């Protein structure tokens, strides 16, 4: 008699005595609700129909040589699961109050949106890097040109270091501006730019201040001049109220484009040439804004 599909068959040629097994007479075979038949022989083979399990050999035991039938509980055969299956079933049951599930978005639209976001971030980052590199290159070029404008490269470098030390010691350009020039209480310093002013004696290093009321320039160091037979020293200063501004003209040398200038013209046609800016573009923008502000005041 062939056992039903899915049942377990055990065969052995050595009789086994096991008190835990329920022994029944062969006449009652088929009457009991048994799903498993064990034939006692010398070698035990356990095979499960419908599975890929390899037959397992059990150790032989000595006993009488009679054939006996043994009944197993159906729950012991069909009720067990593999550990992974148990974990999966308990997880899917939702009995753990600390576990939550949300569906993963795997649609093409979601993937496309993610890629577009990444492209946008990388694009903005690339533009910022390019702008920073351009500004760094411009600053390096302006610094080199600033130092070259002076009659002595070494003197220009030392003068710039001395000016920076002075600004730090005095507490910033705002205090130096108010100490150097007459100002109104409501007047505000908007910007300051290290540069040179072209004079009959050559380029003079100094700082151009742009306030809410005027343009003001002062040399970093005092200049010598003759007063009769005596030599005197004084700082070179230029002050132009905003309402007296007529034009601001940026330009560059045809021979050497790195040499950039800003021409400032007053309403009474006095011209002032500034050059060697560390921040040329910023100076042009600030001066043009001041020109517009002065034009509005004069109306």
UniProtKB/Swiss-Prot annotation:
Coiled-coil portions: none
Entry's Gene Ontology cellular component terms: vacuole
Tissue: Ubiquitous.
Basic and acidic residues bias (residue ranges): 1-16
Protein name: GLABRA2 expression modulator
Signal sequence bounds: none
Compositional bias per record (Polar residues), positions renumbered to this chain: 78-95
Segments traversing the membrane: none
Subunit structure: Interacts with CDT1, a DNA replication protein and TTG1 (TRANSPARENT TESTA GLABRA1), a WD40-repeat protein involved in GLABRA2-dependent cell fate decision.
Domain GRAM: from-to ranges: 175-252
Superkingdom as given in the UniProt entry: Eukaryota
Similarity field: Belongs to the GEM family.
Species name: Arabidopsis thaliana
Biological function: Involved in the spatial control of cell division, patterning and differentiation of Arabidopsis root epidermal cells. Could be part of a complex that negatively modulates GLABRA2 and CAPRICE expression via the maintenance of a repressor histone H3 epigenetics status of the GL2 and CPC promoters.
Gene Ontology annotations of biological process type: regulation of epidermal cell division; root hair cell differentiation; trichome differentiation
Start and end residues of each stretch annotated as Disordered: 1-112
């Amino acid at each position: 008699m062939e056992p039903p599909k899915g049942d377990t068959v055990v065969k052995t040629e050595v009789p086994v005595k096991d008190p835990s097994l329920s022994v029944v007479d062969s006449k009652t075979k088929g009457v009991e609700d048994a799903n498993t038949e064990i034939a006692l022989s010398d070698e035990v083979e356990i095979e499960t129909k419908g599975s890929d399990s390899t037959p397992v050999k059990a150790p032989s035991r000595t006993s009488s040589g009679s054939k006996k039938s043994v009944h197993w509980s159906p729950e012991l055969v069909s009720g067990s699961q593999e550990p992974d299956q148990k974990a999966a079933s308990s997880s899917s049951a939702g009995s753990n109050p600390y576990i939550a599930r949300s569906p993963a978005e795997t649609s093409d639209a979601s993937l496309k949106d993610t890629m577009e976001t990444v492209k946008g971030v990388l694009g903005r980052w690339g533009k910022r890097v390019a702008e920073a590199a351009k500004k760094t290159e411009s600053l390096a070029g302006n610094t080199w040109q600033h130092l070259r404008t002076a009659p002595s490269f070494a003197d220009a470098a030392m003068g710039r270091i001395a000016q920076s030390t002075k600004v730090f010691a005095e507490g910033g350009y705002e205090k130096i501006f108010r100490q150097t020039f007459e100002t109104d209480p409501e007047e505000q310093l908007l910007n300051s730019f290290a540069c040179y002013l072209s004079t009959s004696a050559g380029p003079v290093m100094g700082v151009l201040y742009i306030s809410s009321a005027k343009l003001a320039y002062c040399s970093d160091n005092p200049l010598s001049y003759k007063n009769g037979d005596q030599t005197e020293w004084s700082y070179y200063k230029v002050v132009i109220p905003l309402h007296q501004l007529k034009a601001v003209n940026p330009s560059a040398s045809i021979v050497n484009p790195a040499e950039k200038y800003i021409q400032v013209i007053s309403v009474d046609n006095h011209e002032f040439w500034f050059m060697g800016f560390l921040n040329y573009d910023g100076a042009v923008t600030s001066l043009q804004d001041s020109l517009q502000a002065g034009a509005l005041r004069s109306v």
